[in-house]
Design a protein with these regions (language model features):
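N-terminal subdomain of nucleotide-sugar transferases
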Residues: 1-67, 403
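Carbohydrate-associated surface elements
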Residues: 174, 196
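Glycosyltransferase donor-sugar binding loop
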Residues: 251-269
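Nucleotide-activated donor-binding/catalytic signature segment of Leloir-type glycosyltransferases, i.e.
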Residues: 265-287
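Short alpha-helical donor nucleotide-sugar binding micro-motif in glycosyltransferases
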Residues: 286-287, 294-299
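Aromatic "clamp/platform" in nucleotide-sugar-dependent glycosyltransferases that forms part
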Residues: 307
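Short hydrophobic beta-strand element within catalytic cores of glycosyltransferases
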Residues: 324-327, 337
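Conserved acidic donor-binding segment of nucleotide-sugar-dependent glycosyltransferases
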Residues: 339-340, 344-351, 360-365
């Protein structure tokens, strides 16, 4: 049976530049899942806020999948919290669009707490089940205490969503445990479905070709990919560099960051100067997703030094390109990384621990290193085809349960 699915992503456009203030793994998740669901014959409309006046209202994401921009406040990039007063307007525009175009949806799948607010409101109007995925949890961020404190408005909204939505999708068992612990969510209403990786895009390239393409030579390349925010622990990665053998020609490449991340970027650049490693560090800025496989393939390893990840999509992308990973014990890293084979997991992001595992990977002889193709094979079960199948099964389960009670 074909499903008509309304996805809501108010603050983050799935086609936005990755690595910026409002665009990251969630944007990739929504775009890839919508595309794969459309390929399977389901109809998917993704609703997002117009953040530029030049946007086409409707953009095709793929077969049966559309991105629809709705006006809610000024058509410009604004802080996430500043979007909250415009959520009612967004919901009103969404319902107007649906009515005008004669659309019917079987279910709502919202992403992030702002979208969850809209989903709760619209659900009562449409009388269909509301499934949410929060992607990160404000209470967890506050418990960690790194970066800007999340407001009570977000915490309370997430608690309400955990109480009255019809299903919460968590990308990892750890995130499920957080939902239960911090928000008293019912375990029976939480389903764990991991994130996926585009195996057609993220694939191994010849290292020499990738390095030539990026004008890199024989340096040992350590890669970071992600948003430039304190929670990512990039400062800890920089502080790990002095622990490494300086006899090697090291190059650290940091990908990510836009005008919304300037304060953190300047802090990190200043830190690299204090550590006297600024000549070893390249702040690459934003990189288009289609170019990322060149960086992953050119790198000797990728590091995920985060304090918190709900899943850890970057690790999947790196491994799919055949490049090993050193990551903190966050998200689903224990299920993604094969310890000592495709990478290492550290209990926290203490610089000496990160440096130790980087050194271990770099010291492995090529005969002991798992072959690039084997590293890639370790994550093929995370194809978007498999993730979409799991999502559809969950949608059907929720629909059957919802309408059996009506």
């Amino acid at each position: 049976m074909q499903l008509n699915i309304a996805m809501i992503s108010v603050h983050s456009c799935p086609l936005g530049k990755l690595g910026g203030g409002n665009t990251g793994g969630m944007s990739v998740y929504i775009r890839e899942l919508a595309y794969e669901l459309g390929k399977r014959g389901h109809l998917v409309d993704v609703y997002t806020r117009a953040h530029e006046p030049v946007h086409d209202q409707i953009v095709e994401l793929g077969k049966n999948a559309r991105l629809i921009h709705l006006k809610a406040g000024q058509e410009e990039e604004i802080d996430k919290l500043a979007i909250y007063p415009h959520l009612a307007e967004f919901a009103y525009e969404l319902e107007n669009f649906r009515k005008y175009n004669g659309l019917h949806y079987d279910l709502i799948h919202s992403h992030y707490w702002l979208s969850g607010w809209v989903g709760r409101f619209i659900q009562r109007v449409w009388n269909v089940p509301h499934i949410t995925m929060l992607h990160t949890l404000g209470a967890v961020k506050n418990a960690i205490g790194i970066g800007k404190r999340e407001p009570d408005l977000r915490i309370n909204s997430e608690k309400e969503l955990a109480k009255d939505c019809h299903r919460i999708i968590a990308p990892s068992e750890r995130e499920k445990e957080y939902l239960i612990h911090y928000y008293n969510a019912s375990p029976e209403l939480i389903s764990v479905i991991p994130c996926g990786v585009n195996l057609d895009l993220f694939r191994p390239l010849e290292k020499e070709i990738a390095r030539s393409h990026l004008s890199l030579d024989g340096e040992v390349v350590i890669l970071f990919v992600g948003r430039i925010v304190p929670l990512k622990g990039i400062d800890k990665l920089l502080m790990a560099m002095p622990y490494l053998e300086r006899g090697q020609r090291l190059r650290m490449i940091i990908i990510g960051g836009d005008e919304h991340c300037q304060d953190e970027m300047e802090r990190l650049k200043s830190l690299s100067q204090i550590l006297q490693i600024d000549d070893l560090v390249t702040f690459q800025g934003l990189v288009k997703q289609e170019k990322l496989p060149y960086f992953y393939s050119a790198a000797d390893l990728c590091v995920v030094p985060s304090y918190y990840e709900s899943f850890g999509l970057v690790a999947l992308e790196s491994l799919a390109c055949g490049t090993p990973v050193v990551a903190t014990k966050v998200g689903s890293m224990e299920n993604v990384i094969r310890f000592g084979e495709t990478g290492y997991i550290v209990i926290d992001n203490a610089p000496h621990r990160i440096a130790d595992k980087i050194a271990k990977l770099l010291s492995m002889s090529k005969t002991k290193k798992e072959a690039t193709s084997s590293i890639r094979r370790s994550v093929t079960q995370f194809s978007w085809s498999n993730i979409a199948e799991a999502a559809v099964n969950e949608y059907r389960t929720v629909l059957n349960s919802y309408f059996s009670k009506v």
